[in-house]
């Protein structure tokens, strides 16, 4: 299968807007290449091992990439994108380029950017094909996300991992909603959870998550379930983690609260700063009291405990 890769070069303040526009027109994935982020991680984690293509940092401007299936509808949706960009980011504020890529190229090209990242005090996420010199006390999670969401390096995932370090109870039950690659489910199991249910509506993500659980030696703890949110999950959990988007989290809050045991905690991430208030209100209305807020850039993660 072939895909149309659309690249928008934009100033930093336009990145989130362009990513939102891509989602609105129905792209099958969004990639953000931000030189500031690239250099930040390259300087923080084994800089000698990083190989950054010059094209990713040449002019210092972020690039946002979206993918549309080459199924005959891409031209119309590309026109929609151009019209919205012209209205919201006029003139030289954005520049658009396109190219056709095969699914095999898309599935493997990202690997050159994926390097080990310390995501918390103890948790380190590394790709299965990379070496990492573990420090004393490190919990190294080996991942191969394939085409599933969740390499472990995005701010929303790192925020979740930091909160998991604090809230996973030894022997407890954890539900990972929208598991993607399974990185959060695997982390919960490695942190001592006794039972983890990893849920995703995408069968590909379920296969990838199961493979990563096996790769990390926690397949006996992690049950992968294909389904929408918690509709196929029974029983209560000590912890529910959902790294999705703000509007879905807000709508999901009552269901999450109903799935928590007394004193249980919901970790919610994937929330842009502007929508954090919306999510907090939804959590409070569902009987959840926010007990911690963590931020990275414009991303927010919340930990909320079920009220007595």
UniProtKB/Swiss-Prot annotation:
Molecular functions (GO terms): protein-lysine N-methyltransferase activity
Recorded catalytic activity of this chain's protein: L-lysyl-[protein] + 3 S-adenosyl-L-methionine = N(6),N(6),N(6)-trimethyl-L-lysyl-[protein] + 3 S-adenosyl-L-homocysteine + 3 H(+)
GO cellular component: cytoplasm
Domain of life assignment: Bacteria
EC numbers on record: 2.1.1.-
Key word Transmembrane helix present: no
Pfam family for this entry, one: PrmA
Principal location class: cytoplasm
Compartment(s) where it occurs, according to its Swiss-Prot or TrEMBL record: Cytoplasm
BP terms from Gene Ontology: methylation
Keywords annotated in UniProt: Cytoplasm, Methyltransferase, S-adenosyl-L-methionine, Transferase
Binding site for S-adenosyl-L-methionine: 157, 178, 200, 243
Similarity annotation: Belongs to the methyltransferase superfamily. PrmA family.
Function (record text): Methylates ribosomal protein L11.
Protein name: Ribosomal protein L11 methyltransferase
Organism whose genome encodes this protein: Pelotomaculum thermopropionicum (strain DSM 13744 / JCM 10971 / SI)
Lineage: Bacteria, Bacillati, Bacillota, Clostridia, Eubacteriales
